[in-house]
Amino acid sequence: RAELPAVEPDGFVVRHQLDVPVDKAAAYARLLAIARWWDPAHTYSGRAESLSLTAAPGGCFCEQLADGGFVEHLRVVLAQPGTTLRLAGALGPLQELGVSGALTFTLQEQRADLTRVTLRYAVSGRTPKGLEGLAKPVDFVLGRALQRYATSLAAPDAARE
């Protein structure tokens, strides 16, 4: 399920939800293995293997660049293993606009081998042209990311991580 529950000139909210065929621990572990599911087309380097996500105080969803540089995509602000992962920051083209965002993944066990994953990204801030025009592209990218995440969990080794 996907929805854009709020789209305003000064912000928007993107929400996606799906069920994955693993328990909450495996679902959470795969969230952290972001290089296994993030679309390389939505990186600066074009290489998903350059991505990392550290679930620790001040942890980073970061990307190493070939020239020795890096990109801090988001900063980890809440990590509750098996339950919630929240990151703060502005993804992609939002970064240079000076807006803020909160990306939250919530995991809810439906049964022993089925977890509901909800992605919610709330963005706010003022820009000269407003943020309404960015809501649908961000919704598309994050919806695709969550689908890739779910597909990666269908791999035979997913439940063993």
Model-derived features: where do they sit?
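Hydrophobic-ligand-binding modules of eukaryotic lipid transfer/binding families
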Residues: 1-19, 106-110, 140-143, 151, ...
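Hydrophobic-ligand binding "helix-grip"
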Residues: 51-52, 67-114, 122
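Hydrophobic pocket/interface hotspot
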Residues: 26-31, 61, 76, 87, ...
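A conserved amphipathic terminal alpha-helix motif
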Residues: 116, 122-161
